[in-house]
Amino acid sequence: MSDAIRPQPGILDIALYEGGKSHVAGIQNALKLSSNENPFGPSPKAKEAFLRSVHTLHRYPSTDHAGLRHAIAEVHGLDPARVICGVGSDEIITFLCQAYAGPHTDVVFTEHGFLMYRISALAVGANPVEVPERERTTDVDAILAACTPHTRLVFLANPNNPTGTMIGQADLARLAAGLPAQAILVLDGAYAEYVPGYDAGLALIEERGNVVMTRTFSKIYGLGGLRVGWGYGPKSIIDVLNRIRGPFNLSTTQLETAEAAVRDQDHVARCRADNARWRIWLAEALAEIGVPSDTSMANFILARFSDTEEAEACDLHLQTQGLIVRRVAGYKLPHCLRITIGDEASCRRVAHAIGQFKRMR
């Protein structure tokens, strides 16, 4: 790189994002449990919509995403004018940082929070502020103490990735009420559908003018390969985000498939119930062999080992058995492995392999 050609401040401080592994050298048909994907895939209705979309590939997609926005609004009881759609919830996070953060401002998030918060903050030249958690759970008081007149955005995944822990409505309300006047609370609800009865902050959004929610179709809807997400918030904020959103940021295929997916809530309910059953089973099975985890409300558990060496050794053993899980040292949890909840056979297989590893120690 020429000394005269330099990127904007903060860009070179960004560590390249590393996604979950998808294969193991020398192993055919390895079972991927590293990216929190739905083992049952998308709704059959979503698959049908995907196939139908091939007949209009020569046409530009809509610029206002009206069909998908109205479908989301109908399912969740929202105002469609306050829904914004993006290329995964990542793009909504990026929009928020582009619109409200920048040099000499702070973006706050928790120490084990989603890595994209730091990346998006640095990309706009903002100062990332990492706040300690308490036993791998959000500490509202610590977040409030970290806020200053420079704070513009506070990102909180609830349930959190990679811990699976979450805080209740009272704590969320206290956090929103305690933020500086210029700050926006962004509630990342990527895993909200896995929590029965949880509104992901919708009530707070209606009560206050400083709360925005992001959601994704990559998890329970099984559309990770398509990259579709959405956000909801005060009309004034959504209007700002739409001003920087590209007019054709989502393809017709993305829009029509996601619309069919969100309308099939029977599929969502089945996936949620199956996930809850096997999440509890796997957590209990691992606890019985000395591998604890916090109560997870998402579609994964964070298995804790005695130290980094044991976690890495277990990961290597799992790979020899054709099982791919996620190391989370990048989240400051080097002694842990994040394990996606698969179907029954997958959960039994990973529990057996970890038990085998523990017996060999």
Curated annotation (Swiss-Prot):
UniProt-listed GO biological process terms: L-histidine biosynthetic process
EC number: 2.6.1.9
Keywords: Amino-acid biosynthesis, Aminotransferase, Histidine biosynthesis, Pyridoxal phosphate, Transferase
Molecular function per GO: histidinol-phosphate transaminase activity; pyridoxal phosphate binding
Key word Plastid present: no
Biochemical pathway: Amino-acid biosynthesis; L-histidine biosynthesis; L-histidine from 5-phospho-alpha-D-ribose 1-diphosphate: step 7/9
Top-rank taxon: Bacteria
Cofactor: pyridoxal 5'-phosphate
One Pfam assignment: Aminotran_1_2
Reactions catalysed, as given in the entry: L-histidinol phosphate + 2-oxoglutarate = 3-(imidazol-4-yl)-2-oxopropyl phosphate + L-glutamate
Modified residues (N6-(pyridoxal phosphate)lysine): 219
Keyword Transferase: yes
InterPro entries named among the record's database cross-references: Aminotransferase_I/II_large, HisP_aminotrans, HistidinolP_aminotransfase, PyrdxlP-dep_Trfase, PyrdxlP-dep_Trfase_major, PyrdxlP-dep_Trfase_small
Cross-referenced PANTHER family: HISTIDINOL-PHOSPHATE AMINOTRANSFERASE (PTHR43643:SF3), HISTIDINOL-PHOSPHATE AMINOTRANSFERASE 2 (PTHR43643)
Family of the protein in this entry: Belongs to the class-II pyridoxal-phosphate-dependent aminotransferase family. Histidinol-phosphate aminotransferase subfamily.
Subunit structure: Homodimer.
Protein name (Swiss-Prot/TrEMBL): Histidinol-phosphate aminotransferase
Annotated source species: Cereibacter sphaeroides (strain KD131 / KCTC 12085) (Rhodobacter sphaeroides)
Organismal lineage: Bacteria, Pseudomonadati, Pseudomonadota, Alphaproteobacteria, Rhodobacterales
